[in-house]
């Protein structure tokens, strides 16, 4: 989450005039993440999150995201349900940009996830996959494997600027991933950005909720697990924590056992998931607005994860 769009008191009052939420009491920006502008709003009736959609958010995709959040909440999954205005609309406009209000969810993210957090996060991810079954809308993964080569072609010079020789290494990775990419795995709604800052825990350490579904799409469930392994199971020194990974997968399988094909696919999917986040971080590196309250994330963090996958895919003991 971040803040790229400033909102005046008058603009906020006019926006809230369409809702039955009372008057604004407090309103402040949330300076985390890199995608949208987010604000914590407190009114005389409760607390909410106002999101103004920026950057990659395509207006035509927003109904999918908001309807998905409503679907998940209505099916018992702890996600931030969008708030409808008096006319029943959840997708609104402020300062000429699409915007939405959602419920404020209690809980805290884990800044330094433990093995226990990983187990809980894994179970929460499986719960999400099951809760999304039957959601009628569809959205292709526009940051999935078929799009990576095209994305990289726009940023080859940026890669070389970060690390001489990196472009050739990435070209080789992309070719190998294209040849080995799994097909036909169990699929459905995935989060696709299930990072520690998008998962909340209760005070006792149990899973509380997931937020920030604005990369959600239809893809292989095991790919979502791979994204999550990369996000949760690498230590600050770049080493892979296999104990945390096994705990995460065990937590997942509390609710949804993996098929043999999914287990076998996790190593290549994890390599691909590292590629996806390397590429989007590379794209963000030179394009984050100068006045934003956020720094772009280091693409080389995910290049180092790619290096681990190149040399030691057996680290992913999904079946262990």
From Swiss-Prot:
Query: What Pfam families is this protein classified in?
Result: APH (PF01636)
What is one Gene Ontology biological process annotated in the Swiss-Prot or TrEMBL record? threonine biosynthetic process
What the entry lists under InterPro entries is as follows: Aminoglycoside_PTrfase, Homoserine_kinase_II, Kinase-like_dom_sf, Pseudomonas-type_ThrB
Which EC number(s) does UniProt give? 2.7.1.39
Q: Which keywords fit this entry according to its UniProt record?
A: Amino-acid biosynthesis, ATP-binding, Kinase, Nucleotide-binding, Threonine biosynthesis, Transferase
Catalytic reaction annotation: L-homoserine + ATP = O-phospho-L-homoserine + ADP + H(+)
Which CDD domains would you find in this protein's record?
A: HomoserineK_II
Q: Please give the pathway this protein is involved in.
A: Amino-acid biosynthesis; L-threonine biosynthesis; L-threonine from L-aspartate: step 4/5
Question: One MF term in GO for this entry?
Answer: homoserine kinase activity
The text of the family note is: Belongs to the pseudomonas-type ThrB family.
Q: Which NCBIfam families match?
A: PRK05231.1, thrB_alt
Q: What is this protein called?
A: Homoserine kinase
Q: What is the lineage of its organism?
A: Bacteria, Pseudomonadati, Pseudomonadota, Alphaproteobacteria, Caulobacterales
